[in-house]
């Protein structure tokens, strides 16, 4: 169950980040509200995850996969450009997250 919580936390963090970009500095009501609600749900499920998994694994997985998925959203939805350094960095983040989950300590 903790990994289900983590998936929900990551998903809502990515959704919240997209809403945050769309809110244009909290100047648009609906995207601003979406940001607040999404991050509220995100942190609730992140805290539920931390009841079962170590902080280092939880946070690294949440932050790393959140960054990767947010980058994908930024490319697809917001038409942002990336370069080779960005791609290499994302691959390194994925390797780090996978390594922590395979070799990291558990409760």
From Swiss-Prot:
Annotated membrane topology: Multi-pass membrane protein
Annotated localization: Cell membrane
Stretches assigned to coiled coil: none
Keyword Cell membrane: yes
Stretches of the chain found on the membrane's Extracellular side: 21-29, 76-85
Keywords: Cell membrane, Membrane, Plasmid, Transmembrane, Transmembrane helix, Transport
GO biological process: glycine betaine transport
Pfam families: Multi_Drug_Res
Molecular function as annotated in GO: amino-acid betaine transmembrane transporter activity; antiporter activity; choline transmembrane transporter activity
SUPFAM superfamilies with a match to the protein in the record: Multidrug resistance efflux transporter EmrE
Regulation of protein activity: Ethidium export is inhibited by N-ethylmaleimide (NEM).
Transmembrane segments: 3-20, 30-47, 57-75, 86-103
Cytoplasmic side: 1-2, 48-56, 104-107
Superkingdom of source: Bacteria
Record-linked InterPro entries: Small_drug/metabolite_transptr (IPR000390), Small_multidrug_res (IPR045324)
Gene Ontology CC terms: plasma membrane
Result, substituting residue 42 to D/E/I/K/L/P/R/V: Confers sensitivity to ethidium bromide and quaternary ammonium compounds
Family as reported in the entry's similarity comment: Belongs to the drug/metabolite transporter (DMT) superfamily. Small multidrug resistance (SMR) (TC 2.A.7.1) family.
Biological role: Multidrug exporter. Is implicated for the resistance to bacteriocidal quaternary ammonium compounds and ethidium bromide.
Full protein name: Quaternary ammonium compound-resistance protein QacC
Gene name tied to this protein: qacC
């Amino acid at each position: 169950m903790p990994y289900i919580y983590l998936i929900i936390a990551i998903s809502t963090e990515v959704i919240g980040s997209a809403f945050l970009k769309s809110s244009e500095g909290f100047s648009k009501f609906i995207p601003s509200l979406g940001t607040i609600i999404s991050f509220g749900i995100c942190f609730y499920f992140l805290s539920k995850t931390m009841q079962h998994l170590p902080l280092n694994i939880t946070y690294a997985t949440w932050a790393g996969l959140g960054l990767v998925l947010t980058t994908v959203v930024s490319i697809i939805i917001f038409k942002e450009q990336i370069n080779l350094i960005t791609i290499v960095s994302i691959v390194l983040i994925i390797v780090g997250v996978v390594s922590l989950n395979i070799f990291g300590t558990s409760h």
